[in-house]
A protein has these predicted regions:
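Glycine-centered structural positions embedded in regular secondary structure
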Residues: 4, 135, 139, 185-186
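N-terminal amphipathic, basic helical "cap/leader" segment at the start of enzyme domains
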Residues: 4-115
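A short, structure-level motif marking secondary-structure boundaries and short turns
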Residues: 9-10, 129-131, 187
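Short, small-residue-rich loop/turn micro-motifs
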Residues: 17, 121-125, 187
Length: 188
């Protein structure tokens, strides 16, 4: 996954980079889907930047993506060959959920089963009673991942082919939490 040693513990990520990068219009122009990924891993800085862009805090109690009524019902989990982690945006930290390679549960396609990183976007429907609102938020989260990947010269693709029940079990989700989308991310 990253340049750090992976163990069955939480990982404090470095402060996300909030300035610089590719100009927005250039990132939009470069945005694309790709199903080709090397086995090279992202650095902790890249993970921090991507997850902050996905659903981090950019001002007090407000996220980088809009959430209807500011319910903030969405979470991001990362799935690596070594473990599953939940992103804790207030602390910019990865919370260890479980060890082991669970990528086969998160993907029906071979390219995603072998990719070094999958990002699962999860809605807690107890916080947001309208699934359509959660869908709006997950769309914004996914788009931020696409734009960040374009800015970094990385590949990504959004996927809806996954084992919902297997993922819920592997990620230890509650009854009210549901995976809405999975996005594979990696180097070319």
């Amino acid at each position: 996954m990253t340049s750090c040693n992976l163990t069955a513990q939480d990982i404090q990520l470095p402060e996300p980079t909030r300035k610089g990068g590719m100009p927005l219009m250039e990132a939009i122009n470069n945005r694309h889907s790709s199903r080709e990924f090397s086995d090279a891993t992202l650095t902790n800085q890249q993970l921090s930047d991507m997850l902050w862009a996905t659903c981090g805090y950019n001002r007090p109690d407000k996220r980088t993506v809009a959430t209807a009524l500011n319910r903030q019902e969405m979470s991001a989990y990362i799935v690596t060959p070594e473990a599953i982690y939940k992103y804790e945006p207030k602390e910019n930290k990865l919370i260890h959920i479980t060890s082991g390679d669970h990528r086969d549960v998160f993907a029906a396609q071979d390219f995603a089963k072998n990719a070094p990183l999958n990002v699962a976007l999860v809605a807690d429907l107890a916080k947001q009673d309208k699934k359509e609102f959660a869908g709006m938020t997950v769309g914004a989260m996914s788009n931020n991942i696409y734009l960040w990947c374009a800015s970094e010269g990385l590949n990504t693709v959004t996927r809806a082919s996954f084992n919902q029940e297997g993922m819920k079990k592997a990620m230890k989700l509650s009854e009210t939490e549901e995976v809405l989308l999975v996005q594979t991310v990696g180097k070319k």
